Amino acid sequence: MGNDTPLAVLSDRPQIFFNYFRQQFAQVTNPAIDSIRENLVMSLTEYIGRVGTGILNPNESNCKMVRLPHPILTNTQLDILCNIRYKGFNTIKLPIVFEVSKGKAGLQEALENLCHDAEHSVDEGYNYIILSDRSVDEEHAAIPSLLAVSAVHHYLISVGKRVQTALIVESGEIREVMHAALLLGYGASALCPYMTYAILDDLVKRGKIQENYATAEANYIKALKKGLFKIMAKMGISTIRSYRGAKIFEAIGLSESLLKTYFGTDTSTIGGIGLTTIARDAIKLHDQAFAMEKEEKESGHKFMFLPALGQFHWRKDGIRHAWNPETIATLQLATRKGDYELFKKYAAMADEKDEPIFIRDFLDFKRNPIDISEVEPEESIVKHFVTGAMSFGALSKEAHEAMALAMNYLGARSNTGEGGEDSERYYTKRDGISLSSKTKQVASGRFGVTTEYLVNAEEIQIKVAQGAKPGEGGQLPGFKVNEIIAKTRHSIPGISLISPPPHHDIYSIEDLKQLIFDLKNVNPNAAISVKLVAESGVGTIAAGVVKAKADLIVISGAEGGTGASPASSMRFAGISPEIGIAETQQTLVKNGLRSLVRLQVDGQMKTGRDVIMTAALITLGCVMMRKCSANTCPMGVATQDPKLRAHFRGDYHYVINFFMFLAREVREYLAQMGYKKLDDIIGHTELLTRKALPADAAQRWGQATIDKWNSLDFSNLLHKESGDTSYFCTKVQDHELDGVLDEQMIKAAANAIESG
């Protein structure tokens, strides 16, 4: 599941500028915070205004500040701020608009003028600058508010005047919590989402909201505050004053020159667009709005609804989704019938899309064909595959057991997820196949983690973060906790079970090393894996994890994950698995650590071309309703409701068929590439090339879309570290178990243990 829509830079639709950014988060090296249960240490209180220039000699000039309980201002509060009559409190509004007719040149000119006007305002003694797009009209489009505030913020820093004023954004663009977080993170002191307030007022007047306006407004602000707490907590930050201006985001699909000029950084993993495309998209959205207004006037009919484009659910003529009714139906039919030709049809739909959705859709393989008989058999290839971690509790008993049966039959591995496993499954077989999952997960809640659980594992996975919602932890609602799940998790039926965002015994690499050591002592024969989430800097974290003696590292991509993830996290947290695994591989090779660890990756891997994990649920009957947390899954896959579980029509043979089809397709690709084993291509990025666009690309997708795609640069992604070093795992970690007291006691008691 997860986010299966295109990145902003890959979309053929005009994008708001916020969509090019992703949240960063803490993992391993420092802990995330539980913003709900540790709310006592969280604060959105701000003091905004001029900071006196002589901070070592404090006087009344340091006191020209306004205390805000939170940074979300109402229209009334902004009006009060604009009209403060106290001496030394001066406010000015600067328009953030540009001339539509001038395009990119107009946007660039407007940004330059805005920065100089802001500096001049500071020199004139204005300690509150309001950046407002209320002056938008048919000839003037709004400058993206994030671009405007970041440009002014960094310009004032460069001239040494930033602390002499507060920057307040008054914009109709602000709607979601991510928008607010980005504006604050790039320098805004406070925000006023006036358009949202206007929409709330209209909804109340039309009876669409059964509250008065004051209550609706307060509820909206409360939701934004909770969201800001959540986003700050992901990074382990407890106060907005530490978060403001910290730039704890990463841009995906923006050019280095743009980031250097307006955002104070030049790090861009895959390159991307500049002012030309930003201006073009802003003008498109502007023109659409005014065309609609013109049509309303001419027809006398007021448009009450915007089109439902299907950000999360597939809609005809809406946003493109990798999982759509056609791909889901074809895959399910192929696995039920055991029809490989039908699977190839599904793979063609997934791989040969009309337009790219993922970064890997731009890549192709170099070919040097050999006879397929020279390539290792499917039965060997399939053992490289694992399923994603999906807990018993999130999934129904039937679905969870079907995954284990299929993977055990294939000699591959299923994963328990964080909910433990019924101990009866360790010793139970069905059709001669064990029901026990080979990979046992240890998450922050430690549900179901016992010595018996750990000793029955071939791999023990420490889940530090989850791709679809890193830094957030999880919760199994009480209505899904029935008697068997409560027994498995050592809890009480009907009680919600909470996994906190951090492991409270892992606040550093050293703490992780201790947990790995402890788990290895419980089960010396099990491999210890650590699950991380793709983000900028994950390579450095992975290097520390290898030094902490992990045997395996999972890099989880933002596109994978769970149907129970918060919508905002699904869209805006984490990055593509291609970027995360590339950085991890390069960092480990460069530091001579790659030979000590195996790497896995997950996130929308659906075909032999993608290879590996997340499609296993689809083959069991999932129809992507994205209601996993609501206990209302109509297919009986992700529910504990007995009536709905009776609808489950999945069978472990379907999962077997899927993975064998996947292995067969991988084998065919290996033959085309000229390699005999899957291990032979690990780390060899020189085998990947960028696909050429078809000759009629501009005609099919429009020149604007082609310009976006051509702005991408995958050289960092495909960089291969040189030197005499291994590109895959060739050694076994030394877990330093010799001489441990446990071992001495076991040896001393060996005779008594064996004799009973």
Which residues are covered by each model-predicted region?
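Flexible, glycine-rich loop/tail regions that form catalytic "lids" or insertion modules at the edges
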Residues: 1-108, 117-121, 125-128, 179-180, ...
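Glycine-rich phosphate/ribose-binding loops and adjacent secondary-structure elements
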Residues: 90-240, 250, 255, 259-261, ...
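Mobile "lid/hinge" segments at catalytic clefts and subdomain interfaces of large enzymes
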Residues: 187, 196-199, 224, 228, ...
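Short, flexible segments with low predicted structural confidence
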Residues: 371, 378-379, 483-484, 491, ...
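Broad structural signal for hydrophobic residues in well-ordered alpha-helices, predominantly aliphatic
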Residues: 407, 519-520, 670
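Helix-loop-beta element that forms the nucleotide-linked donor phosphate-binding surface
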Residues: 447, 494-496
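Flexible, charged surface loops at secondary-structure boundaries
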Residues: 453-456, 546, 753-754
